[in-house]
Amino acid sequence: MKALVTGGAGFIGTNLIKRLLSDDYDVVSIDNYSTGKKENHQDGCLYYDYDLSYNYVRDDGDRYDVIFHIAALARIQPSLLDPMDNIKNNVLSTLHMLEYGRSKNIPIVYAGSSSKHHAPYGSAYAWSKWSGEQLCQLYNECYDLPTVICRFYNVYGPYQLLDGAYATVLGIFERQYKNNETLTITSDGKQRRDFTHVDDIVDGLVKSGMALLGEGNSVISGQEFELGSGVNYSINEVADMFGKDYPREYLPKRKGEYDKTLCTDMNAYELLNWRPDRNLEEYINNFLEDNDG
């Protein structure tokens, strides 16, 4: 089996490639390294460096069995500062991958976002990811291209970014804790998030890809799967896990943020036999043990 992973040098893409290689896939990555890192490269994967917002996909003559389209400029705040760059990158790269998949009849698993449920017009990022979903459904219905949409909920885990505009909440807290810095929290910290470990996300992606390639794929093609833990925590509760008395600083509320994310759709449970089994508190406890020694 041969898989193409876009965004393969980034947070989720790197974890996905590690899993695919362990499952004996041949893997090729495309990444423009805007947030991906070459130190994330995995032995056994072939990496290409170019921008998918341009209509070009390198083709060495080998047909891929499945495409995992993970590449995107993520995060709400950077997209508010530069909406054109975010929309150009996210929408055009998705359109180009779908057209490539259509030309070769290659199934595509698309990385969606739970922001679709909250404020699809609240930021360029949310709109661009929602628009990508619409393009997937268009190509599925008009051109019979097998597609699956997997929506992510506040992903955390190995290879997450620890600083900069694209860092995750957990990544920022981890960096601040390691450096004995105050934890920074936007707004009042009461906003709740469904945090999902990247290994669970990867498991959902791989199961989606396998389902598209297996018998009965007509049931799977066109589906939208919510990949969330089904449990949410306030940011204050997450900060408490690093120590109830650990210092924290509250920053002004930011535009585009929403009050709650929570996965309640069990479609992935029923059709993919997917279950999230990683626990946020256990993850943070392990982090503290590793860094308090």
Predicted segments, located by residue:
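C-terminal substrate-binding subdomain of Rossmann-fold SDR/epimerase-dehydratase oxidoreductases
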Residues: 51, 178-293
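Short aromatic-enriched loop/helix-cap "lid" or pocket-rim segments at secondary-structure transitions
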Residues: 38-41, 60, 160-164, 198, ...
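NAD(P)-dependent short-chain dehydrogenase/reductase
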Residues: 124-126, 130, 134-193, 198-209, ...
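Short, surface-exposed alpha-helical segments at coil->helix boundaries
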Residues: 38-39, 133, 171, 232, ...
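Acidic donor-diphosphate engagement hotspot in glycosyltransferases and nucleotidyltransferases
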Residues: 16, 120, 160, 200, ...
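Gly/Ser/Thr-rich beta-alpha loop segments that engage phosphate groups in nucleotides
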Residues: 9-12, 38, 114, 159, ...
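N-terminal Rossmann-like NAD(P)+-binding domain of SDR-like oxidoreductases, especially those catalyzing
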Residues: 1-155, 177, 205, 274, ...
